[in-house]
C-alpha cells in the first residue's frame, strides 16, 4: 500500500491555489430568434451599441443596426449558413474598422480590409474606423489645386480641383467607369493615392479594371475595394465607407488622394434591401428616410485640408446610374444636391460616336474653376459657349434650307470642336497636349481642315510637338501657363502640321 505523505498533499494544494485564476470574463451574449435574408433577430445583447460588430457561433460577423424593445436586428456580413435559431451571438464591443497602411497600395481588399487577390496578408500596424466624422470648417481650405483627369473636355470645361466632389452620372454603358479609370491612369507621377471602390459589380468587371490598371502601371498607387454583386448587402453598403477610410488615412498624412465610388446607386439599393428587411418604414421609391444622410456623410468626408492639418486632400468622384436619362429620380437628385458639380453622360451622344459622351450643356463644376490651370483657362473660356451655340444652331439648321455664310462657318467650327474633343479610352492627355488641341479649335486655325481629318490632325499635332517641339511641352507642363513664346511655337506647329496635311490631301 502506497503511503500518503501530508507534505506532498499540502504542496499540491498550495500549487493549485497559487495557479487559481480568479478573473471573471464578462461577455454580452444573446440568442438568435430568427434568421433569414441576411438579417438576424437576436434576443439579449442588452448592452450592445448601434453599429457594433457582433460575432455569431459559426464565426460570421454582423452589425447591430436595429435596437428594439425586445430584440436586436443585425445584418450579416457573410453567408451565415451555420447560424440556426437558438445559436449564441456575442457582442464584440468594437465598431467596424479597417486596417490601413502603405502596404495596401496595389492590393484588392474586401470592405473589411481583408485581401482577396491571393497575394497574402497585408501587414498593418494601425486601423481606422470605417465611419468617421468629416473634417470641420476650420480644418478645411477652399479648393485651389487642379486634379487633371487627362480628358480634354473635362479639364477644359468642367475642371475638377483637389478636395472636390464631382458626380459622374449617366445611363448604363455610357462610359462612366471609363472616365474614372482614365482619371486614375492620369495620376501617374502626380503623387496621388487612388482608391477605387467597386459596389455590386460583376466580379469579371472588377478583374478587368485591375488588369487595365496593372497594364498602365497605375496599380502601384491604387487600392481597390471590391464588394461584388454576389456579396452580402451589408458588405455592399459598407464598401464606400471603407474606401473613404483608406483614403482618409493618406489624406491626414498630407497626401493628395482620389476616391471613386462605382457606383452609389448599388449602395443605395443594398441599403434599401437591408432597411426593408429590418422593417424600417419605407419612403420615396421604397428607400428609407435616411438614405440622403447615408450619402451626405460619405461625400462630406472629401475635403482639402488646411495647412495646419497637413494640407492633404481627398477628391471624390461618385458615380450614379440613371434609368433612361432620368436625373430627377430620388437618388440622382440627392447626390446632385450633395456634390460640387456633375458630369452628365448621354447615351444619345455615346451612340452617335462622341466619346467620352459628355453633355457639356448640363454638366457643371461649381468649385473647380478656382483650381483650373491658367494655361487652359485662358483659351477654353469660350469653348463651352461655342459648343452650346453649335448645338442650338445644329437643331435649327435641320429645318432651314439655305444658311448664310456666317452660320455655316459657325456650324463647321462647332463640328470640328466636337471632333477635337473625341478621345480614345485609357489614353489620357497631358496639359500641354490639351492646350494645343483646344487652342487650334477655338482660334479657328483648323477651319480649313476637312471634318473627317480633324482626329488625324489632332494626333499628328501631338506627335509633332513631342518630337520636334519638346520645348513647348516642357514650358507648358512646368509653368502651367501659355506665355507668348509658347504660343508662338504652338501657332507655328499648328500651321506646319495643317499645311503638310492639306498638301498631301
UniProtKB/Swiss-Prot annotation:
Task: List the EC numbers from the record.
Answer: 7.1.2.2
**UniProt cross-references to CDD domains, sorted A to Z:** ATP-synt_F1_alpha_C, ATP-synt_F1_alpha_N, F1-ATPase_alpha_CD
Q: Name one GO molecular function term.
A: ADP binding
Q: Topology versus the membrane, per the UniProt entry?
A: Peripheral membrane protein
Cite the PROSITE patterns for this sequence.
ATPASE_ALPHA_BETA
Q: Which InterPro entries match?
A: ATP_synth_asu-like_sf, ATP_synth_asu_C, ATP_synth_asu_C_sf, ATP_synth_F1_a_nt-bd_dom, ATP_synth_F1_asu, ATPase_a/bsu_AS, ATPase_F1/V1/A1_a/bsu_N, ATPase_F1/V1/A1_a/bsu_N_sf
One Pfam family, short name: ATP-synt_ab
Q: Where is this site: Required for activity?
A: 363
Sites binding ATP sit at: 170-177
Which UniProt key words apply to this protein?
ATP synthesis, ATP-binding, CF(1), Hydrogen ion transport, Ion transport, Membrane, Nucleotide-binding, Thylakoid, Translocase, Transport
Return the GO cellular component terms, semicolon-separated.
Answer: plasma membrane-derived thylakoid membrane; proton-transporting ATP synthase complex
Its domain of life reads Bacteria
User: Among its keywords, does the record have Repeat?
Assistant: no
Q: Which residues cross the membrane?
A: none
User: Which of the seven top EC classes does this enzyme belong to?
Assistant: translocase
Q: Where in the cell is it found?
A: Cellular thylakoid membrane
Kindly state which reaction or reactions the protein catalyses. ATP + H2O + 4 H(+)(in) = ADP + phosphate + 5 H(+)(out)
Q: What does this protein do?
A: Produces ATP from ADP in the presence of a proton gradient across the membrane. The alpha chain is a regulatory subunit.
Q: What is annotated about its quaternary structure and interactions?
A: F-type ATPases have 2 components, CF(1) - the catalytic core - and CF(0) - the membrane proton channel. CF(1) has five subunits: alpha(3), beta(3), gamma(1), delta(1), epsilon(1). CF(0) has four main subunits: a(1), b(1), b'(1) and c(9-12).
Q: Which family does it belong to?
A: Belongs to the ATPase alpha/beta chains family.
Annotated HAMAP family: ATP_synth_alpha_bact
> What is the protein name stated in its UniProt record?
ATP synthase subunit alpha
Origin species, per record, is Prochlorococcus marinus (strain MIT 9303)
